[in-house]
From Swiss-Prot:
GO terms for biological process: mRNA processing; RNA splicing; tRNA processing. This is Maturase K. Keywords: Chloroplast, mRNA processing, Plastid, RNA-binding, tRNA processing. It is found in: Plastid, Chloroplast. InterPro entries: Domain_X (IPR024937), Maturase_MatK (IPR002866), Maturase_MatK_N (IPR024942). One of its GO terms (molecular function) is RNA binding. It comes from the Eukaryota. Usually encoded in the trnK tRNA gene intron. Probably assists in splicing its own and other chloroplast group II introns. The lineage of its organism: Eukaryota, Viridiplantae, Streptophyta, Embryophyta, Tracheophyta. The keyword Oxidoreductase does not apply. It comes from Gymnocladus chinensis. The keyword Lipid biosynthesis does not apply.
Length: 499
């Protein structure tokens, strides 16, 4: 980000925040190569080294200064040569540079807003597992939940128009339209849903920026409605790209209001609605009446229809009671369960039995989808019976065990937050037995003969890491107690969830 600041200052005074001239700067493509999501494009697809790739960029910039070389007809073939290279690659190089240039002012704006508010970043909250402790703290006291999937834009122009208030120069809009419409014309037979998937794979940096800004526009309604509902003068929240910044700003606002409006502090510490999002899936939850939740639902529907031109039926957004329905989020089925307890109280000669009911959040592993995924990867059949992995049978014993261990370790690492570990143990059992069958297949033996020859020590590595983690949590407990430990463990080093 410091590199962004240095380079942008060189052009800001002359170009007045215009982004279009930045695509003629070589350092933009250098930043795209170093920082890009698709940094291997210029190397792997062409077989050139870094110097040759930068030479291609210099030649492209030289040709762009010449007349009519930036505009390519949509009717041309994909294999029209430009400097001897594929036309798709040419557009991809330019789109990478354009994506970097359009990211710079928004990133700098975000950093400046954080410095003004003096917000301390907490890197632990970047973990997606930090959402579940939030669920445990808040959701037992809530009544209703609604899971909402943010719709994809149905037209390319919507992606362009979301930037109209933030980018000043019209040339950048025309260039963005050129990338989107030209690519869409090349793939005119592809449906819009498949086109979005294809575009996200071919131009990930540009797609992620456009989609994140699109989601940011969608989430702006929550700040607007919060201001209208509270009847208090709140400072503007600006553009928030990450959940941690949104959460931190809300906390900072609570501290400010604590000095000026002490009587209304509870309104912000215990807000009337909670909103959590990961990628395109969001959760709305509240302890108010269904009427209040329905108002929020229609706010969202009218926002989609009037601002994004996306038609959505109200019946597709369901409002459910947390005590009766579970919701799926980040690989877990979660619901609020009533946990009854009986306490015997004695006062002098009289004794009383007090029944107490507490709400507790349950997080359950979706065992059936996981078994389907394992069956698709040929670790088991559709019924969950382990089978061998013939593709790996040609590898060494160490590589086979290491591959199974890596998969088992990742699943155990992510799903250790489950309330019921039986499903997790079943998945690990499938992987262990599949590993044994693969080794037995390689050595042309049966499972029983193979285990008799090597002993059960061959599978002890599957348990080693989990015991080490539990020993850190319960350092004074015996190994037997550690094995019987069934508490939930949330890790703060998981940054993404591969769906």
């Amino acid at each position: 980000m410091k590199e962004f600041q240095v380079y942008l200052e060189l052009d800001r005074s002359r170009q007045h925040d215009f982004l279009y001239p930045l695509i003629f700067r070589e350092y933009i493509y250098a930043l795209a190569y170093d920082h890009g999501l698709n940094s291997s494009i210029l190397v792997e697809n062409l077989g050139y080294d870094n110097k040759s790739s930068l030479l291609i960029v210099k030649r492209l910039i030289t040709r762009m200064y010449q007349q009519n070389h930036l505009i390519l007809s949509a009717n041309d073939s994909n294999k029209n040569q430009f400097l001897g290279y594929n036309k798709n690659l040419y557009s991809q190089i330019i789109s990478e540079g354009f994506a970097v240039s359009v990211e710079i002012p928004f990133s700098l704006q975000l950093i400046s807003s954080l410095e003004e508010e003096e917000i301390v970043k907490s890197y632990n909250l970047r973990s997606i597992h930090s959402i579940f402790p939030f669920f445990e703290d808040k959701f037992p006291y809530l009544n209703y939940v609604s899971d909402v999937r943010i719709p994809y834009p149905i037209h390319l122009e919507i992606l362009v128009q979301t930037l109209r208030y933030w980018v000043k120069d019209a040339s950048s809009f025309h260039l963005l339209r050129l990338f989107l419409y030209e690519y869409f014309n090349w793939n005119s037979l592809i449906t819009p849903k498949k086109w979005i998937s294809t575009f996200s794979q071919s131009n990930p940096r540009l797609f992620l920026f456009l989609y994140n800004f699109y989601v940011c526009e969608y989430e702006s309604i929550f700040i607007f409605l919060r201001k209208k509902s509270s009847y208090l003068r709140l400072t503007s929240s600006g553009v928030l790209f990450e959940r941690i910044y949104f959460y931190a700003k809300i906390e900072h606002r609570v501290e400010v209001l604590d000095k000026d409006f002490p009587s209304t502090l509870w309104f912000f510490k215990d807000p009337f609605i909670h909103y959590v999002r990961y990628k395109g899936k969001s959760i709305l939850s509240s302890k108010n009446t269904p009427f209040f939740m329905n108002k929020w639902k229609y706010y969202l529907i009218h926002l989609w229809q009037c601002h994004f031109y996306v038609w959505s039926q109200p019946g597709k957004i369901h409002i459910n009671q947390l005590s009766e329905h579970s919701f799926y989020f980040l690989g877990y089925f979660s619901n609020v369960r009533l946990n009854p307890s009986v306490v015997r109280s004695q006062m002098l000669e009289n004794s009383f039995i007090i029944e107490n009911v507490m709400k507790k959040l349950d997080t359950i592993i979706p065992i059936i989808p996981l078994i389907r995924s394992l069956a698709k990867a040929n670790f088991c059949n559709v019924l969950g019976h382990p089978i061998s992995k013939p593709v790996w049978a040609d590898s060494s014993d160490f590589d086979i065990i290491d591959r199974f261990l890596r998969i088992c370790r990742n699943l155990s690492h992510y799903y250790n937050g489950s309330s019921k570990k039986k499903s997790l143990y079943r998945i690990k059992y499938i992987l262990r037995l599949s590993c044994i069958k693969t080794l037995a297949r390689k050595h042309k033996s049966t499972v029983r003969v193979f285990l008799k020859r090597l002993g059960s020590e061959v599978l002890e590595e599957f348990f080693t890491e989990e015991e080490e983690i539990l020993s850190l949590i319960l350092p004074r407990a015996s190994s037997t107690l550690q094995r019987l430990y069934r508490g939930r463990i949330w890790y703060l080093d998981i940054f993404y969830f591969h769906q």
